[in-house]
Amino acid sequence: MKRTILILICCLVALSSCKKSGIDAFRGDYTFKSSGEVFLQREPSGESNIIPATFNYTLPNEIGQLEIRTLDSKENTVVVVMNYMNGEVIVTQGTCKDQEIVLEEFQRNALKVSMYSYISTSCIVNVNATGHIYDDSTIVLDMVYEGTATIANLNYHIRGNSIQMVATRN
């Protein structure tokens, strides 16, 4: 009886220590949703009574598929493919360590900012992202957007550090 209990305890300890880390924790296919807010500040120029000099803009929720594949297991690097439902596809690289992933800076060209019902523009933003994996199935990426936009012939600087992408393993 004591021997059986000892074997059972050893098996439980061995199984509980099998937590994935690094590339193995992140590799796979995910479904994601992203949301957040950016701040736009007009660059000094002529006056405009129609468009404010600064404003916050809540980004529309975006969904898509996220794929993480091994690039170099010795260097802990991965290839990350984000396939947005709007047709935008982003490919970047990242580095995994323990339960954390850091993506190389990438650019988004399809980001749209709308103001009022008649003013809309596409923006170019550079994105930095870091994230963690939870329960071996959910990645939470915190993103920082930095870029420019031209709205009604006025140039704006875009900054956002409250953008999050939550990805769940398929």
List each language-model region with its residue ranges:
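Positively charged n-region of N-terminal signal peptides that target proteins for export
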Residues: M1-T4, K19
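Sec-dependent signal peptide hydrophobic core
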Residues: I5-C10
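C-terminal motif of bacterial Sec signal peptides marking the signal peptidase cleavage site
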Residues: A14-S17
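Tryptophan-anchored aromatic micro-motifs
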Residues: D24-S48
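A short hydrophobic beta-strand element
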Residues: Y30-F32, V78, L103, I133-G147
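Flexible, solvent-exposed loop segments that connect beta-strands
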Residues: F39-T54, N109-Y118, T150-Y156
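Predominantly extracellular/secreted and cell-surface proteins with exposed
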Residues: Y57-A129
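Edge beta-strand at a domain terminus
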Residues: D136-N170
